[in-house]
């Protein structure tokens, strides 16, 4: 079972990835992790990737796909895997298909942008302890003050509203063509097309988990 998990920043992909991975006994595959591992090990692909990164350029799709193919030969992928943050682009999706890497399911966790912005921009954190609050859902007793120490809370740069909006713009620009590509394969009756599930991402974490697992177990 090979699964691609899609969803904008802030929809809870990390949490749901863990549930899927544990339920089906398949590893999460992250291109970032693969790159770091290959560079650290000094493999031919790692050396090539490091050269590109050191020059300030983006690692090519060719190198990324080669890393994915290499990762899939590992024994822990014998029953499948969960792709985390990959493919990101239409070019990568087409390259997967061209190289015969079959995908069984695509799960999109769907949350409206307005909800995501509220979730992320409302976060506040106590940096020293890591304690996290939310101005609406889990507010501190005193505005912007840590309950235990009385020290000020901080809003991370990534959680600022303008930053969240920009990240969402990038996500939609990259992912909407990807979604259209896979849906077209399915609608055209392609026998190799993955099954596509769009999962409502609002509600309790456990409810979202149950929706995803129910879809994948049908």
From Swiss-Prot:
Q: Where in the cell is it found?
A: Cytoplasm
Q: Which domain of life is it from?
A: Bacteria
Q: Which Pfam families match?
A: ADK (PF00406), ADK_lid (PF05191)
Task: Locate the residues binding ATP.
Answer: 10-15, 123, 132-133, 203
Q: Which UniProt keywords apply?
A: ATP-binding, Cytoplasm, Kinase, Nucleotide biosynthesis, Nucleotide-binding, Transferase
Q: Which residues bind AMP?
A: 31, 36, 57-59, 85-88, 92, 156, 167
Question: Region NMP: what ranges?
Answer: 30-59
**Which terms in the GO cellular component ontology are assigned?**
cytoplasm
**Any domain commentary?**
Consists of three domains, a large central CORE domain and two small peripheral domains, NMPbind and LID, which undergo movements during catalysis. The LID domain closes over the site of phosphoryl transfer upon ATP binding. Assembling and dissambling the active center during each catalytic cycle provides an effective means to prevent ATP hydrolysis.
Assembly information from the UniProt record: Monomer.
Query: What is the purpose of this protein?
Result: Catalyzes the reversible transfer of the terminal phosphate group between ATP and AMP. Plays an important role in cellular energy homeostasis and in adenine nucleotide metabolism.
Q: What's the protein here called?
A: Adenylate kinase
Q: Which organism is it from?
A: Pelodictyon phaeoclathratiforme (strain DSM 5477 / BU-1)
């Amino acid at each position: 079972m090979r699964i691609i998990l899609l969803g904008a920043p802030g929809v809870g992909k990390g949490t749901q990835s863990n549930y899927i991975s544990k339920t089906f006994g398949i590893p999460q595959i992250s291109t970032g992790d693969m790159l770091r591992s290959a560079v650290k090990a000094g493999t031919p692909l790692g050396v090539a990737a490091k050269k590109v990164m050191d020059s300030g350029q983006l690692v090519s799709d060719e190198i990324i796909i080669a890393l994915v193919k290499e990762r899939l030969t590992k024994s822990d992928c014998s029953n499948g895997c969960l792709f985390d943050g990959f493919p990101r682009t239409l070019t990568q999706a087409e390259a997967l298909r061209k190289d015969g890497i079959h995908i069984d399911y695509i799960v999109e966790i769907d949350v409206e942008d307005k909800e995501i912005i509220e979730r992320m921009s409302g976060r506040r954190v106590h940096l020293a302890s890591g304690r996290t609050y939310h101005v609406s859902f889990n507010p501190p007793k005193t505005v912007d003050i840590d309950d235990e120490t009385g020290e000020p809370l901080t809003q991370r740069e990534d959680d600022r509203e303008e930053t969240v909006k920009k990240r969402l713009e990038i996500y939609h620009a990259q992912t909407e063509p990807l979604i259209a590509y896979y849906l077209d394969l399915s609608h055209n009756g392609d026998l190799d097309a993955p099954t596509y599930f769009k999962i409502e991402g609002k509600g309790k974490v456990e409810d979202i988990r149950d929706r995803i697992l129910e879809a994948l177990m049908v």
